[in-house]
Swiss-Prot record:
Complex and partners: Interacts with PLK1. Interacts with CDK1. Interacts with SMAD3.
UniProt-recorded name of the protein: Regulator of cell cycle RGCC
Induction: Up-regulated in oligodendrocytes in response to complement activation.
Residues that span the membrane, as ranges: none
Region spans: Disordered: 57-111
InterPro entries, A to Z: RGCC
Residues bearing PTM Phosphothreonine: 111
Origin organism lineage: Eukaryota, Metazoa, Chordata, Craniata, Vertebrata
Record keyword Calcium present: no
Amino acid sequence: MKPPSTQSSPAAVAAAAPAMDSAAAADLTDVLCEFDAVLADFASPFHERHFHYEEHLERMKRRSSASVSDSSGFSDSESADSLYRDSFTFSDEKLNSPTDSTPALLSSAVTPRKAKLGDTKELEDFIADLDRTLASM
């Protein structure tokens, strides 16, 4: 990635985002200037770099690995991963299962698909079992 050829100026930021107030524009300018400095630093040879990114990265890794865990023994990142994984499962279950508010007529009106040519016996058995399960609900 090449660093941008033009530096961000407060006037350019203000022109690009006229709806921003002056404090937000100043903050954005500071962030863009810092970003430009980092890009320029990465473009320089390793021994001439001004910032110590490896040290900062290791410090952040240590800080995140020493995050506070709850009483369950799972760290924040493990809990977040689990929640993220389970949210898909939960949404699939919620979408594909009838609820108390679903009228009985709607759930019985859905007809199961017929097995297509080339399907295996195992798949047909699974569908038949699924039909029986849905019929008993």
